[in-house]
Amino acid sequence: MGKKGGKKRQHRESALLGALATQDESRLQVRRTPKLYIGGAFPRSESGRTDVLSLARGGSANIARASRKDLREAVKVARAAAPGWASRNASLRGQIMYRVAELMEGRAAQFRDDLVAHGYGKSDAADEVAASIDRLVWFAGWPDKLPAVLGGTNPVASSHFVFTIPEPTGVVAIVAPESSPLLGLVTRLAGVLAGGNVAILLASEGAPLPSVTLAETLAVSDVPAGVVNILTGRRAELMPHLSRHADIDGIDLWGCPDELLIDAERGAAEHVARIARRPHGEKDRASAFTGERGERIDGMTAFLEMKSVWHPIGS
């Protein structure tokens, strides 16, 4: 009876596995629908437009194509979130950024798949994901150290104590690097957040999937809604409006294409926005973000204002 019972059980298990395999082959896979990330939500573009992006290993993805109105909405929610993020304890901001790194570690396979879909080899993709997580941890250690490193007490001739402290610029727009769609993206974004700024990120046009996955990661992290907003779409369409928006305080133009760079700088100058850009003559290269080249304090100081406070000395 024991042998017969065992054979019957094996037969039932084989039949069940076969049925599950057949079911798996017959079901339709739930396809990913990448959207914008604005104010902690995932809206489609108000225009309803999408761009069809061909993937390196076959297949395609429908990427939301942000409009001028989507950009205005992102600026609106970023401005509303700016005071709360800037006023948070600096140590807490660092802990929140570290939590994002933890969540990225848990989604490492998804980030790797995104990079492979854009033409990376599996080994190179794994290396970039690991480096991106490490980079975020590096920046997460800085928020509570910036006042000590950059601030100080200034000697003056009058009877005053003079203290200088760094303060965030406010709303910063970031044009993500095309050359490094994850590591470059994390490097530029983390520097802005560490300084207490809020961000509107214009994702890589050619490789937007890592930005989409980062948005999905931020949505379940402790980063408050509106602190990071991510738009996908066409840079030639969005850059003129982004650079000239009067409620954007700073623009990181590292990933801006050469043909759009001069117009973007002119647009920023019209409302005196701070800008950061790659050095003159330097191309948007992935090597700029690898190793110690990406671990630079100027990624934070580019969007910090130095405020001096004068306090009279009593007699």
Please name every model-derived segment:
Residues K3-A117, W310:
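Short, structured beta/alpha segment
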Residues K3-A21, E25-S26, D134-V149, F163, ...:
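C-terminal segments
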Residues A56, G141-P224:
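Conserved small-residue-rich beta-alpha loop and adjacent elements
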Residues R57, R93, G196, V228, ...:
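Residue-level signal for inorganic ion chemistry
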Residues R72-K76, G84, G94-A109, G119-V149, ...:
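Long amphipathic alpha-helix in the N-terminal Rossmann-like dinucleotide-binding domain
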Residues D124, H160, E237-L238, L260:
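Short acidic active-site motifs
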Residues A190-L193, H241, G267:
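Hydrophobic/aromatic ligand-binding patch that stacks against planar heteroaromatic rings
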Residues T232-W254:
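A charged, well-structured terminal subsegment
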